[in-house]
Amino acid sequence: MTKREKGGFAMTAIQFATNSLPFHLFQDYMNLTVTFLKYSNNYENQKDNFLIQYAREDDNYYAVQLIKALEIGPSGLLKSIFTDYWNYMCQFGIAENTEHYFGGLCMNGNELIEKYRNQDGSRNEFVYKLVMAYVEWKGYEMNQKSVVAA
């Protein structure tokens, strides 16, 4: 990974963490990520559709950066989180039963936040915000106390 590529990913990570990335783009990116992890043979079509969708909008710059972040694969955090999350949900069966599924999201949110704590033991805010955004993306409202112990 070149310096420029690393810089592009770092910028994307900062945008996720500071919520400066347009949320509808984040939603679409999560869909694209699932496609990437589950159906890599269909990824090219999804990627093209994603870029075309934002080609005439102010969001195009963000869209291109997100694609780069996904394709390059960061040397650590974001790819690890997505892979862990997706593997967990596959084991869980991605149940149709909403309550069952909701339980999976809660447990896995805790697991990810625990796994990626800072060295001093404090919560990693980037991971926390990413998990919460993923849960919001899935359309579930939850009390933060039931998901994460501060």
Can you annotate each of these PLM segments?
Residues 16, 20-27, 72, 76, ...:
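Short, solvent-exposed segments of well-ordered alpha helices
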Residues 101-150:
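Amphipathic alpha-helical binding modules
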Residues 54-75, 126-146:
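Repeat-associated, polar segments at repeat-unit boundaries in modular proteins
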Residues 75-96:
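Amphipathic, heptad-repeat alpha-helical segments
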Residues 22, 26, 78, 82-85, ...:
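Short runs of predominantly hydrophobic/aromatic residues within well-ordered alpha helices
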Residues 7-68, 82-89, 147:
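Short terminal alpha-helical segments
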Residues 30, 34-37, 67, 71, ...:
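Residue-level detector of alpha-helical secondary structure
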Residues 3-5:
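Extended amphipathic alpha-helical elements
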